[in-house]
Amino acid sequence: MKRRTLVMALTLSSSVPGVARAASKAESQAEVRKAAQDALAAVYKVAPSARKAVESAAGYAAFSNFGMKILVAGGGTGKGVAVNNKTQATTYMKMAEVQAGLGFGVKKFHLVWVFETEQALSTFVNSGWEIGAQATGSAKLGDTGAAYQGAVSLSPGVWLYQVSGDSLALELTAKGTKYYKDGDLN
């Protein structure tokens, strides 16, 4: 009986990647950097002007996220990097989201934050960013030009591009979202 239990436990643990072998810090960092590059590529595909916005900004953050909603509750997680364009300093970050309201579904989405000032980037990296249930935004092009076309202005000097599949989301409807440093990868 003990042998059968041991065989079943080994079989189950080997079928779960996180249990079977923990990735090294370097491997985990590489996976997060790849996910961030995928997020940038997805945004550039649907909003080509975002490339200039990212490259000319003080810094940016790129996240690849996964969310799920079942009946009245939902949530999501994600990982990404924040990069200071001047120093090329990279900070590994995480995202967690909690939602309430009716719904059902699973989605994968990419977020690219653009920070016009080093102060805005520093605040994001060192204090995180929380978005409450009332957070909404609209694309503002007026004085800022076409570089931010398709982005949501969250605060002065902070823009957000959100891509789900191959389409650009022009409205942010995040609820209870927190961004914070990844203590294991930094």
Where are these regions (language model features)?
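N-terminal export leaders
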Residues: 3-7
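Small-residue-enriched, tightly packed secondary-structure blocks
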Residues: 23-186
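Bacterial N-terminal signal peptides
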Residues: 11-15
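Sec/Tat signal peptide C-region and signal peptidase I cleavage site
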Residues: 18-22
